[in-house]
Amino acid sequence: MTTQSEYDYIIIGAGSAGNTLAARLTEDAGVTVLLLEAGGPDYRLDFRTQMPAALAFPLQGRRYNWAYETEPEPHMNNRRMECGRGKGLGGSSLINGMCYIRGNAMDYDGWAKEPGLEDWSYLDCLPYFRKAETRDIGPNDYHGGEGPVSVTTPKAGNNPLFHAMVEAGVQAGFPRTDDLNGYQQEGFGPMDRTVTPNGRRASTARGYLDEAKKRSTLTIVTHALTDRILFEGKRAVGVAYLVGDSDTRIQARARKEVLLCGGAIASPQILQRSGVGPAEVLNKLDIPVVHDLPGVGQNLQDHLEMYLQYACTQPVSLYPSLKWWNQPAIGAEWMFLGTGIGASNQFEAGGFIRSSEAFEWPNIQYHFLPVAINYNGTKGVQEHGFQAHVGSMRSPSRGRVQVKSKDPREYPSILFNYMASEQDWQEFRDGIRLTREIMQQPALDPYRGREISPGIDVQSDEALDQFVREHAETAYHPSCSCKMGTDEMAVVDGQGRVHGLQSLRVVDASIMPIITTGNLNAPTIMIAEKIADKIRGRQPLPRSTADYFVAGDKPARGKPLREISHQA
């Protein structure tokens, strides 16, 4: 298999965090790294993962998607809901929507109030966001110019619906912001995307591994499914894994550390299979307990969202691009020029608002899309249309991940427990009603047709709740299932080191104590950049001195240009 079976570090999972660690650790001369990935390579000629506008395709099938399903969700009509996770070099950055959103400064300041997490404040994290990024319009106090992640900003001349939707949000009384990752996240504005200057998906495989794999000290094994982490006493000493369809377990040893970067579903699963987790779960499955750690797989969080869809009265939406006869020309322009519809994820505008003054920072996120279709490419509305994705950001609901057997090929039991709190329902009711007010503003008068979904007959609390139960979907942001902290349910410390064990860290979205306000790819890369310096024994980057917006006692909303009354 591999000639050498001992390495300084073994990284499990070549996703957004794992690839970042692999690249940074091998910058140090002589440091050897084994990077294990259960999926395959990120084939550069496969338009499904490389063309931004094709983002729905890799979610279909199982080549690039683990395609997990939840247990029946009790507050969602007992639906088994999708839980897509990336499989292949790049992990979920190979199949995500490419929205580059870092979260709100207050998310990180909130983490830093927890004992042991004092150095996770926004100004401590900002230098690592900048380190990871190359933004196409150049660096500033908030953005980087030399990092491995290519970030593309929306350009003049893009779809007029993006501008109309942002204007409508401002006319509805909400703030405007020119950069959702800059001084002020709160408000409506253009949304950056992780796309290269020539219109390709900027996954972490492209950004970090393309450089790192030139180094002889990095060994990458694809189709390598981790069975378990190997321990001697309380010290992690290696990994046992399977390659392809083989049942032969290959062992590799780590001289320094094992770094678990499987993401919020796989990391707790691998820990539990390795004997690290709630003892009662492990005992039931006859898994020998290495360390009883009750928080492994608990505290699971996600973002739930739904779409409001409208007909478009002018032929400016992307509806024609869904027709097969128009797609060859779109594909050719993208392939040869790196431009056109294919070069964008089409989420070029969005926003963050507070649905009430009860929230210190935004609790609702919008993505605007100039076509009416399901995120996974199904159920396209057969006419010109547009939609707003709306969802709550910091639900109090908590779920869990549990292994069902010792077999590494068996999927775990996943329950998010979506919409378990009254706050969830109130936020979604408010979110839908506020979206309708935004959509009725003058900026959308030239374009707005009838409301396709939910439909104008869906007005009462009960009707809205029923719509959410039946139609809300995951935003694909699972996180927090191996949280950082010092309390009895924390799994790792502020450097990702697993409590009670030696030489083992978890570095991915699972270690977030509380989910961030927005998409999770950029924060996951930042977390890995920050912990990479800890592993390497380097001084942390100097704290930023940039200003950032805190709402304080500012109202969540001003007077709308056009007042809209809600039917009860």
Curated annotation (Swiss-Prot):
Enzyme Commission designation: 1.1.99.1, 1.2.1.8
Catalytic residues (positions): H477 (proton acceptor)
An example Gene Ontology molecular-function term: flavin adenine dinucleotide binding
Necessary cofactors: FAD
Family: Belongs to the GMC oxidoreductase family.
Gene3D superfamilies xref list: FAD/NAD(P)-binding domain (3.50.50.60), Glucose Oxidase, domain 3 (3.30.560.10)
Pfam family, one: GMC_oxred_C
Domain of life (superkingdom): Bacteria
Residues that bind FAD: 8-37
InterPro entries linked to this entry: BetA (IPR011533), FAD/NAD-bd_sf (IPR036188), GMC_OxRdtase (IPR012132), GMC_OxRdtase_N (IPR000172), GMC_OxRtase_C (IPR007867)
GO cellular component labels: membrane
Biochemical pathway: Amine and polyamine biosynthesis; betaine biosynthesis via choline pathway; betaine aldehyde from choline (cytochrome c reductase route): step 1/1
Chain segments annotated as coiled-coil in the UniProt record: none
GO BP, sorted A to Z: glycine betaine biosynthetic process from choline
Summary of the function given for this chain in its UniProt record: Involved in the biosynthesis of the osmoprotectant glycine betaine. Catalyzes the oxidation of choline to betaine aldehyde and betaine aldehyde to glycine betaine at the same rate.
Catalyzed reactions per annotation: choline + A = betaine aldehyde + AH2; betaine aldehyde + NAD(+) + H2O = glycine betaine + NADH + 2 H(+)
Keyword vocabulary terms for this entry: FAD, Flavoprotein, NAD, Oxidoreductase
Protein name according to UniProt: Oxygen-dependent choline dehydrogenase
PANTHER family with a match to the protein in the record: CHOLINE DEHYDROGENASE, MITOCHONDRIAL (PTHR11552:SF147), GLUCOSE-METHANOL-CHOLINE GMC OXIDOREDUCTASE (PTHR11552)
